[in-house]
């Protein structure tokens, strides 16, 4: 097994995840099987209970793991499926070490950071890498070098470097070159960051430097000299128009070749699919406008996978999707604002929790339905579409979800039966992959091209089966089901009106878009042409 370990310095949020994903993409295009592990040095067991404002979206894996959004980038770039074990947290490590101590596994020894915690970290990394069957395992250590939280993980990989043959492990350090008022890129923060890393016993083979513009030659020379790496291994990771360009940018600088040389890997395979996909992305000539009506609109990372899935649909349909975030509560406070949605070619209601903004979202759903604007509702978005339909079409006055109104006379959305009595929040929802059978001839069957699908879920509430027949008699169709669970709702005869209880965005890939998103964008493109009289 070959390991590539990525650390970060100067500040957090530099893009270590995109760096790892891009390196992995390029190695995959050389014919290697690649996997990735994200280490998050927080005490939370997973990301499931974190606020989107604090940590961005929670990405859901096939096995139900609720993880950091970086794993979503890994899956999209590497076109792979990971598991909850690919996300290590301090909480997971300490929980296991303490459990072993309580069982007596340490045979009366004093349990310490070294060796017990570091051994657990190394063991988990190696087990995950081995189980994946990969040739190369990329590891991102979250946070910044110098953070007290990441010390045990840095010590663990230092020990791995000592235990593994030198040709089996490579270290990459991501830093930042800031520009002064004269436009000169300053290298001192990078120098100090590498110095701090070396004080921990780690020396990077490669330094990836984030910057606004391409790294100046003088800056590259300074970093190479003072950080003691060859100049060709100082890589410019300057801002790109789109993150999907990053693999191509670092490939042009020879990083893949240099890593393969260090790891003693050889390959004559050249897969140009990624380059072709990026070329298609840039060759789009038409633009359509999408409104995402939500409650976490101030932080785009809250809806990262949705934005990426929309982009994938745009690439496949040959158009650029201009996305605007609309705060649902603004529609509630000023109902006249709803008329502004007429300018959009599509409306999307994402998932979420809690009652804040739900009435505003339903106003947007009603507007989309009545004006026949292509619509996609995801998870809570589908549930709200069902409530809106029940209220305004089926005339069930007061219809609601028991999440928002336990005394609703028409609880068309209700708690999953198995959720009754569940007290803990973390890891207790209906999570991960579940199948659905699609109705033949439905919109769902048409866009998926099959009657059997598997998609990822994250919810506690569902369409109440007691109301299904009554609602369907008014024209809505529940075209995807898991036994007696409603997975998809659609309204035939519309340009595109589709809701999914699952989260299709988590399985969307560049070059292989999620069918609901592809269907939405296709309908938007067609609608735009109709509006322009083409």
Curated annotation (Swiss-Prot):
According to the UniProt entry, how is activity regulated?
Answer: Allosterically activated by GTP, when glutamine is the substrate; GTP has no effect on the reaction when ammonia is the substrate. The allosteric effector GTP functions by stabilizing the protein conformation that binds the tetrahedral intermediate(s) formed during glutamine hydrolysis. Inhibited by the product CTP, via allosteric rather than competitive inhibition.
Per the record, which residues fall in region Amidoligase domain? 1-265
Q: Where, by residue number, does CTP bind?
A: 12, 147-149, 186-191, 222
Q: Per the database record, which ranges form the Glutamine amidotransferase type-1 domain?
A: 289-530
- Give the family this protein belongs to, as stated in its UniProt record: Belongs to the CTP synthase family.
The record's misc note reads: CTPSs have evolved a hybrid strategy for distinguishing between UTP and CTP. The overlapping regions of the product feedback inhibitory and substrate sites recognize a common feature in both compounds, the triphosphate moiety. To differentiate isosteric substrate and product pyrimidine rings, an additional pocket far from the expected kinase/ligase catalytic site, specifically recognizes the cytosine and ribose portions of the product inhibitor.
Instruction: Name it.
Output: CTP synthase
Q: Tell me the lineage of the source organism.
A: Archaea, Methanobacteriati, Methanobacteriota, Stenosarchaea group, Methanomicrobia
Please state the gene responsible for encoding this protein: pyrG
């Amino acid at each position: 097994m070959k390991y590539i370990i990525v650390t970060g310095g100067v500040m957090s949020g530099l893009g270590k995840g995109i760096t790892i994903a891009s390196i992995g993409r390029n190695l995959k295009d050389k014919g290697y099987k690649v996997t990735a592990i994200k280490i998050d040095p927080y005490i939370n067991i997973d990301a499931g209970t974190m606020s989107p404002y604090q940590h961005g979206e929670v990405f859901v894996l096939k096995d139900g793991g609720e993880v950091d959004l970086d794993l979503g980038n890994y899956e999209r770039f590497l076109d792979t499926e990971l598991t909850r074990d690919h996300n290590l947290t301090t909480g997971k490590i300490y929980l296991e070490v303490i459990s072993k101590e309580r069982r007596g596994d340490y045979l009366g020894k004093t349990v310490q950071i070294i060796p017990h915690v570091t051994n657990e970290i190394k063991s988990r990394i190696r087990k995950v890498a081995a189980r994946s069957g990969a040739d190369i395992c990329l590891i991102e250590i979250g946070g910044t070098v110098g953070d007290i939280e990441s010390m045990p993980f840095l010590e663990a990989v230092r020990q791995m470097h000592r235990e593994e043959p030198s040709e089996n492990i490579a270290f990459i350090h991501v830093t930042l070159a800031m520009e002064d008022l004269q436009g000169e890129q300053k290298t001192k923060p990078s120098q100090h960051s590498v110095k701090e890393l070396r004080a921990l016993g780690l020396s990077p083979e490669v330094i990836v430097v984030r910057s606004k513009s391409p790294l100046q030659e003088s800056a590259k020379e300074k970093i190479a000299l003072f950080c003691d790496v060859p100049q060709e291994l100082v890589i410019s990771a300057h801002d790109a128009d789109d993150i999907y360009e990053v693999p191509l940018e670092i490939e042009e600088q020879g990083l893949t070749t240099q890593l393969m040389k260090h790891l003693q890997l050889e390959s004559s395979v050249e897969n140009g699919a990624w380059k072709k996909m990026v070329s298609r992305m840039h060759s789009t000539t038409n633009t359509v406008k999408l409104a995402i009506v939500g409650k976490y609109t101030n932080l785009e990372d809250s809806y990262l996978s949705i934005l990426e899935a929309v982009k994938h649909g745009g690439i496949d349909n040959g158009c650029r999707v201009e996305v605007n975030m609309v705060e649902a509560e603004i529609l509630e406070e000023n109902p006249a604002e709803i008329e502004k949605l007429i300018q959009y070619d599509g409306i999307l209601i994402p998932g979420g929790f809690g009652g804040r903004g739900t009435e505003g979202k339903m106003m947007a759903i009603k507007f989309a339905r009545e004006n026949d604007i292509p619509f996609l509702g995801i998870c809570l978005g589908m549930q709200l579409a069902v409530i809106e339909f029940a209220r305004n079409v089926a005339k069930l006055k007061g219809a609601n979800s028991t999440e928002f109104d336990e005394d609703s006379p028409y609880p068309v959305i209700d708690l999953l039966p198995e959720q009754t009595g569940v007290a803990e929040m973390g890891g207790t929802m209906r999570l991960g992959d579940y199948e659905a059978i699609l109705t033949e001839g439905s919109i769902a069957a048409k866009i998926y091209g099959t009657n059997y699908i598997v998609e990822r879920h994250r919810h506690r509430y569902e369409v109440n089966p007691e109301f299904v027949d009554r609602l369907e008699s008014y024209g809505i169709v529940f075209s995807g089901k898991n036994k007696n669970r409603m997975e998809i709702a659609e309204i035939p005869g519309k340009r595109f009106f589709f809701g999914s209880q699952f989260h299709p965005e988590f399985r969307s890939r560049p070059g292989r878009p999620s069918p609901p998103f592809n269907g939405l964008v296709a309908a938007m493109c067609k609608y735009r042409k109709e509006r322009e009289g083409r």
